[in-house]
Amino acid sequence: MIKDIETNVVYLSDKLQVFYPDFWGRLIKLFDEFGILWKIIPGTNDIWVRDFMPIQLSEKEFLLYQYEPDYLQDRSYRKLKTDPSSVCSLLGIKCRPTKMVIDGGNITLCGDYVVMTDKVFTENGKKKDDGDFIAQLENFFQKKVIIIPWHCIDPNDENADFFGHSDGFIHWCGGNKVLMSNHREVDPEEAKEIKQIMEKYGFDVREMLFDVKDQDLDWNWAYINYLQVGNKIVMPAFGIPEDKQALKYVQECNPDCEVRQIRMRDIAAKCGAMHCISWNIKE
């Protein structure tokens, strides 16, 4: 699989400039000033391109999974579902298809491993820790797969994480370094388990824990969802005290990268951030 450090272009949904014109203008200006090449994905129905765009194994090899997330099954949300095959055809990208149901936000490359939450089992009608299914995943990715826990106790709770995306918990920083969100503030037991699992596989995990008087949990979960294109990182900011500390975490964990922040409350209010709205590849 292509690593973030190897990528040189980022794709964005054609709907991003329609739905969020102010943010779009600021983001494109930042990309241009930062020297990040960007392109548009035509024919999308929502902005969350990370979830449905294919996995890049090599410069010319792409894997296309079945994008059937449970959170878009309701009739009122079906109109937001983009057909990945259609947009890839428009882009001239040839993909090798698979019947596996996978959500792109639940694919986090960490060196020789791919990290996914255990939601991938239920999405495919499998029992948790199904060894044969894990073997299929590993054959699919050509990587060892690490499964981390995910719990959604009440999907009707507006603050519940019903997505189950691993990119909302961790971000690989090269070598054996992994940066982890402040999930401990929300679910300490689950966060502890995630950290222990990653450490069992030899990773040095640093948690984003904030030293501020009143933490803003409405926003500070989203810092981990940053975008890296080559040695350049674009991460969220929200105009809160945690912004500076989050920037320091990302800079210290990625010392060879340049890091910029962008205000994105309007995007994060919809439960996603920079990684969710982007698809970076090597061309």
Predicted regions mapped to residue ranges:
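The feature marks the mature, well-folded catalytic cores of soluble enzymes
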Residues: 1-283
